Amino acid sequence: MEIILIKPVRKLGKIGDILKVADGFGRNYLLPQKLAIRATEPNKELIVKQKHEFEAKDKQIREEVEKINALIKDQQLVFIRQTSNDGKLFGSVTNKEIANKLSENISYNISHSNVILDKQIKSTGIYTVEIRLHAELNAIVTVIVARSESEAQDYLREQKTETSEDLAESA
């Protein structure tokens, strides 16, 4: 299936790109999410005329996302959870919980689909989580999972000493 991107898509292309994609990917993801349109002759002519408008709109969205990224950057989210004796959580910390806590902290609604977890968080510790609000921009948030507030503070102190040691080694 041949499509024209009307929004930038990570690892695929930018606005106005004409691409061949698998039929299922186009029909089931790109078209319903309004990320692309079919590459028919009338649509190709239309996209040439409207490409500037799409790019201006994307630039405006990107500027807004950059402001939000500045708020998100270097956030530390602390989750207090019950655990077994070996530090395993009863359950897990989900992307929805991270999005909700982050939304509370910055007073801006973050969708759980913007929170990218490499793997589920099922034990205590410090994790880095990617927040992707735009195809080309992302921010990193530190998530601390602990049994108590004092344990969370210990993790923070431990992290600060590690970063100061790293800075001393690089100097």
Curated annotation (Swiss-Prot):
GO terms for biological process: translation. Pfam families: Ribosomal_L9_C, Ribosomal_L9_N. One of its GO terms (molecular function) is structural constituent of ribosome. Disulfide bonds: none annotated. GO terms for cellular component: ribonucleoprotein complex; ribosome. PANTHER family: 50S RIBOSOMAL PROTEIN L9 (PTHR21368). Binds to the 23S rRNA. Belongs to the bacterial ribosomal protein bL9 family. This is Large ribosomal subunit protein bL9. It comes from Rickettsia rickettsii (strain Sheila Smith). The lineage of its organism: Bacteria, Pseudomonadati, Pseudomonadota, Alphaproteobacteria, Rickettsiales. The gene is rplI.
